[in-house]
UniProtKB/Swiss-Prot annotation:
Species this chain originates from: Caenorhabditis briggsae
PANTHER family referenced in this protein's UniProt entry, alphabetically: SUCCINATE DEHYDROGENASE [UBIQUINONE] IRON-SULFUR SUBUNIT, MITOCHONDRIAL (PTHR11921:SF29), SUCCINATE DEHYDROGENASE IRON-SULFUR PROTEIN (PTHR11921)
Record keywords, A-Z: 2Fe-2S, 3Fe-4S, 4Fe-4S, Electron transport, Iron, Iron-sulfur, Membrane, Metal-binding, Mitochondrion, Mitochondrion inner membrane, Oxidoreductase, Transit peptide, Transport, Tricarboxylic acid cycle
Pfam families recorded: Fer2_3, Fer4_17
Record's protein name: Succinate dehydrogenase [ubiquinone] iron-sulfur subunit, mitochondrial
Start and end residues of each 4Fe-4S ferredoxin-type domain: 174-204
Residues the entry annotates as binding a ubiquinone: W199
Positions contributing to [4Fe-4S] cluster binding: C184, C187, C190, C251
Membrane topology field: Peripheral membrane protein
Purpose: Iron-sulfur protein (IP) subunit of succinate dehydrogenase (SDH) that is involved in complex II of the mitochondrial electron transport chain and is responsible for transferring electrons from succinate to ubiquinone (coenzyme Q).
Pathway the protein takes part in: Carbohydrate metabolism; tricarboxylic acid cycle; fumarate from succinate (eukaryal route): step 1/1
Cofactor note: Binds 1 [2Fe-2S] cluster.
Length: 282
């Protein structure tokens, strides 16, 4: 009985030591000795760990051995220090919007955000604010994408069309109206910087989705502008925007969601109307 108890205690000690070693493995890293060592404070959260709570973990990166962008540092940390660090990324060119996160207090894309070369200050990296976190720097985008789907982002016609029978032409002026709208990459930087979206995401569509809604409302080839506007004619969908302008300030593509929302409000209140489609010259 005593031997069995001793064996149990010894096994428990081994398990505890193993747990401590595992928890410290991610934090352990070689001491950097270069001249340009930059500290990154990164949000960590693993929902699969029992009783998991968010923490901030520090990583030191030698900038002389790293690329110039935040995403370069994250990839270096994941490849060389902690393979459990989780984040989204794809194009590395500011096109796909996958690597959107909060860097130094501002929402932006990690692939086009340059590392602050001032090594006396650390750089703080968090997931996009006010969204559920899947793991580490990966936010849950399900609600955002569902809202995007709700605006039916495709051309809708009231006249029957046979694919390939004819083209839907636009004049130069009609096409110009889409500039500054279609370039949105749906990264959600603007929506997650908006206080109205923080507190009313279940009802307020948010800057990114509203800008895309306006893009389809104003498209001269679309015949369902009134129906699209009708779906937004309530107290929350568009009018919850209080023109704080965070969305326009933070957009990594330098678009102006606030202006698009203002145009939607003008259409909803009757101050403006959608221009009639120009007769085709083709």
């Amino acid at each position: 009985m005593l031997a069995r108890s001793a064996l149990f205690v010894h096994s428990a000690e081994l398990a505890a030591n193993a747990a401590r070693a595992a928890s410290g493995a991610a934090a352990a890293q070689p001491k950097k000795t270069g001249n340009r060592i930059k500290t990154f404070e990164i949000y960590r959260f693993n929902p699969e760990a029992p009783g998991a709570k968010p923490t901030i973990q520090k990583f030191d990166v030698d900038l002389d051995q790293c690329g110039t962008m935040i995403l370069d540092a994250l990839i270096k940390i994941k490849n060389e220090v902690d393979p459990t660090l989780t984040f989204r990324r794809s194009c590395r060119e500011g096109i796909c919007g996958s690597c959107a996160m909060n860097i130094g207090g501002e929402n932006t894309l990690a692939c086009i955000c340059k590392i602050d070369a001032d090594t006396s200050k650390s750089t703080k990296i968090y997931p996009l604010p006010h969204m559920f976190v899947v793991k580490d720097l990966v936010p849950d985008m399900n609600l955002f994408y569902a809202q995007y789907a709700s605006i039916q982002p495709w051309i809708q016609k009231k006249t029957p069309l046979t694919l390939g029978e004819k083209q839907m032409h636009q004049s130069v002026a009609e096409r110009d109206r889409l500039d500054g709208l279609y370039e949105c990459i749906l990264c959600a930087c603007c929506s997650t910087s908006c206080p109205s979206y923080w507190w009313n995401a279940d009802k307020y569509l948010g800057p990114a989705v509203l800008m895309q809604a306006y893009r389809w409302v104003i498209d001269s080839r679309d015949d369902y502008a009134q129906e699209r506007l009708h779906r937004m004619h309530d107290s929350f969908s568009a009018f919850k925007c209080h023109t704080i302008m965070n969305c326009t300030k933070t957009c990594p593509k330098h678009l102006n969601p606030a202006k698009a929302i203002g145009e939607i409000k003008s259409l909803l209140t009757g101050f403006k109307s959608k221009p009639a489609a120009e007769p085709s010259a083709f």
